[in-house]
A protein has these predicted regions:
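Helix-loop-beta segment of a Rossmann-like dinucleotide-binding subdomain
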Residues: 86-97, 107, 111-164, 261-266, ...
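Helical element adjacent to the flavin cofactor pocket in flavoenzyme catalytic cores
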Residues: 140-198
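N-terminal Rossmann-like FAD-binding beta1-loop-alpha1 element of flavoenzymes
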Residues: 5-31
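Residue-level detector of alpha-helix initiation sites
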Residues: 9, 13-14, 37, 205, ...
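Active-site substrate-recognition segment that forms the wall
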Residues: 18-26, 35, 48-50, 76, ...
Length: 363
């Protein structure tokens, strides 16, 4: 029997975890390497909304990848639940967007794509969300939007991979890529060298620094996003609420998340009073019962910003055997299933789910 091709996946966020899963299913021998603990960077800081919020604004490559991923999430969440015993709480919630200036663009998008959309008056919004009471106002309704409990999803993915026999080397920082004759040979870590036929970079905001020594200029940079959390009763809110790049969602437990900021501050992950005050104000506007309430938690994560938010998926011409799945900006959770499948298709030589050209790392 032929030896399996070996792969080292660098970075164990949601993109790295699903990449490892898809590559294992494609017949590769996979090892996942993580500088810290699984899913503790941008993935853990995400709200878990499985949408780009304003899908009609998305460039075509982002829209196609998002649509493929969204269509796969319900089955993926169920598969992961059965494989791990942990329910990631995939929830088909729908989304209410209060930016009525987007109506014409949203209507055109729906007609072009065939996606369901509705325009609700204040009375119809109040019927859907009684908690808004007299504060209900007209909205654009996207019934196909879902969300997932990201912490539970990350735990479930980690457990599922371990149950598949995929090694996860945590607290193992990669310091360089091993190379010989223009071919990636593995990685150098603080604990020693790890050899493999292929190396996949899924390190989010830290991706560019891992390959700069090869003259690869990957335009991925950190963008800080901060989120606050309130405690509410279960069932208070069913839909995701969205206005002006800000959102609010309620988990099944009653936790209410409000986000998010987008700050160019380098690798600074500090939380700020300014963000807390701004998001608290937004919370009171979107859900008036939160006016005057104090958030119980605040956190931040560094998203891997890239031009137009279009990720880099595929190989790079400067080093054979080096692959990328990074640069998803604020949509890593949304795009992870499709990104992982597309990369696995390319590495396995299968017909790809989407045209890979728009995502090329050396585009």
């Amino acid at each position: 029997m032929a030896r399996k091709q070996s792969v080292i996946v660098v970075g164990a966020g949601v993109v790295g975890l699903l990449t490892a899963h898809e590559l294992s299913r494609a017949g590769f021998a996979v090892t996942l390497v993580e500088r810290g603990l699984t899913g503790r960077e941008a993935s853990r800081a995400a709200a878990g909304i499985l949408s780009t919020l304003f899908p009609w604004r998305s460039p075509r490559p982002l829209a196609l990848l998002s649509r493929w991923s969204q269509s796969s999430y319900a089955m993926l969440a169920d598969d992961v639940r059965r494989a791990s015993g942990i329910d990631p709480e995939w929830t088909a919630s729908g989304l209410l967007c209060f930016d009525l200036s987007e109506r014409e663009a949203a209507q055109g998008w729906a007609q072009t794509t065939g996606r369901a959309i509705d325009f609700l008056d204040a009375h119809e919004v109040r019927k859907q969300e009684p908690a808004l009471a007299e504060h209900a106002r007209p909205a654009i309704f996207l019934p196909g939007i879902a969300h997932i409990h990201i912490s539970r999803f990350l735990r479930a993915l980690r457990e599922a991979l371990l149950n598949e026999g995929i090694p996860i080397k945590e607290e193992t920082a990669v310091t360089g890529i091993l190379e010989s004759g223009g071919q990636a040979q593995g990685v150098r870590t603080e604990a020693g060298e790890l050899r493999a036929d292929h190396v996949v970079i899924t390190a989010g905001a830290w991706s560019a620094g891992l390959v700069a020594s090869f003259g690869i200029q990957l335009p991925v940079e950190p963008v800080r996003g901060q989120i606050i959390q309130f405690k509410g009763p279960p069932g208070l809110l069913g839909r995701v609420l969205c206005q002006g790049e800000r959102y609010l969602l309620a988990r099944r437990s009653g936790e209410i998340l409000v986000g998010s900021t987008r700050e160019m501050v380098g690798f600074d992950k500090d939380i700020t009073t300014e963000a807390r005050e701004e998001l608290t104000r937004v919370a009171g506007e979107l859900l008036p019962v939160l006016k005057g309430a104090s958030p119980m938690r605040q956190w931040s994560g560094l998203r891997p910003g890239s031009p137009e938010g279009i990720p880099y998926i595929g190989s790079h011409s400067k080093l054979k055997g080096l692959w990328f799945n990074t640069g998803h900006y604020a949509y890593g959770v949304t795009l992870a299933p499709g990104s992982a499948r597309l990369l696995a298709d390319l590495m396995a030589g299968r017909p790809p789910i989407l045209d890979p050209v728009p995502y090329k790392p050396d585009r």
